[in-house]
UniProtKB/Swiss-Prot annotation:
InterPro entries cross-referenced by the UniProt entry: Ribosomal_Su5_D2-typ_SF, Ribosomal_uS9, Ribosomal_uS9_bac/plastid, Ribosomal_uS9_CS, Ribsml_uS5_D2-typ_fold_subgr
Encoding gene, per UniProt annotation: rpsI
Entries under Pfam families matching the protein: Ribosomal_S9
Family per similarity comment: Belongs to the universal ribosomal protein uS9 family.
Key words, A-Z: Ribonucleoprotein, Ribosomal protein
NCBIfam families: PRK00132.1 (NF001099)
Coiled coil: none
Top-level taxon in the UniProt lineage: Bacteria
Name listed for the protein in its UniProt record: Small ribosomal subunit protein uS9
Family annotation (SUPFAM superfamilies): Ribosomal protein S5 domain 2-like
Signal peptide stretch: none
Cellular component, GO, one term: cytosolic small ribosomal subunit
Organism encoding this protein: Cupriavidus metallidurans (strain ATCC 43123 / DSM 2839 / NBRC 102507 / CH34) (Ralstonia metallidurans)
GO molecular-function terms, A-Z: RNA binding; structural constituent of ribosome
Length: 130
């Protein structure tokens, strides 16, 4: 806990989010912008709010987020992971609920590298019989 802020770091793909939460009225600021301005897609907004809605804390915290790297989906997942960790820092009794929903576990899937002689990571050149 930093002052009266609770902290959590979230990661997803190549995105990293540093999340600070404190008691408030439900404002979420991402990189200095309101969340609806920062995340254009409705699915990204839903992903970010999932741990708050699950624990019934959607209107009880002000959240400040610094997120870097990745794209919109990766950043949304990183923010969700960070909010989850910050909620656990605030109240450890929330961990079983969040863990059962799968929000505590870091999604370890990363982009597979492109291999030499292939078009993409696994896509081969088209085979010609003749």
């Amino acid at each position: 806990m930093i002052g009266n802020w609770n902290y959590g770091t979230g990661r997803r793909k190549s995105a990293v989010a540093r999340v600070f939460i404190k008691s408030g009225k439900g404002d979420i600021i991402v990189n200095g912008k309101p969340i609806k301005e920062y995340f254009a897609r409705e699915t990204s907004l839903m992903i970010v709010r999932q741990p708050l809605e699950l624990t019934a804390h959607a209107e009880t915290f002000d959240i400040k987020v610094n997120v870097t790297g990745g794209g919109e989906t990766g950043q949304a997942g990183a923010v969700r992971h960070g909010i989850t960790r910050a909620l656990i820092d605030y109240d450890a009794t929330l961990k079983p609920t969040l863990s059962k929903a799968g929000y505590v576990t870091r999604d370890a899937r990363e982009v597979e590298r492109k291999k030499v002689g292939l078009h993409k990571a696994r896509r081969r050149k088209q085979f010609s019989k003749r």
